[in-house]
């Protein structure tokens, strides 16, 4: 009976650690992505989107060449442990270099934990926001 209890306990601990690791990976990824956007490193940020949206992301990237981001704020994070998905609402302050007028846009980011080439990692499932 003790052996069964300890093996169940060890299994529970391992599953818990795995879940915490997945969430920690998510937090690292979404923060890294937003820091890259904040410092106008859009090319580097383009490594985060899933392959399924990479073409659309690159097109949006071209439209953002004249944009300078000055700040961002994380407004809300919704993390679904079972689905391994997350939504992050980010407020971004920016200006277009041609106008120098400060504007704000909301970026509703969708993230998913995916398996790619034998590796599991968090991928951005939404495009860079449109900077009007």
Predicted segments with their positions:
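Sec-dependent N-terminal signal peptides
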Residues: 4-14
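Short, aromatic-enriched amphipathic alpha-helices that serve as compact interaction elements
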Residues: 22-38
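Short solvent-exposed beta->alpha transition segments
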Residues: 27-29, 42-87
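Sec-exported extracytoplasmic/periplasmic mature domains
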Residues: 34-38, 42, 47-54, 93-94, ...
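Exposed beta-sheet edge and beta->alpha loop/turn motif
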Residues: 81-132
């Amino acid at each position: 009976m003790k052996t069964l209890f300890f093996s169940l306990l060890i299994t529970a601990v391992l599953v818990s650690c795995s879940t915490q690791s997945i969430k920690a990976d998510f937090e690292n990824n979404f923060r890294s992505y937003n820091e890259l956007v904040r410092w106008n490193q859009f090319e580097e940020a383009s490594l985060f989107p899933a392959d399924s949206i990479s073409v659309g992301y690159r097109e949006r990237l071209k439209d953002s060449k004249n944009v300078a981001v000055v700040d961002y704020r994380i407004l809300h994070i919704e993390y679904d442990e079972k689905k391994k998905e997350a939504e992050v609402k980010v407020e971004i302050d920016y200006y277009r270099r041609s106008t120098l007028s400060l504007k704000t846009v909301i970026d509703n980011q969708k993230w998913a934990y995916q398996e790619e080439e034998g590796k599991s990692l968090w991928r951005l499932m939404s495009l860079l926001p449109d900077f009007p």
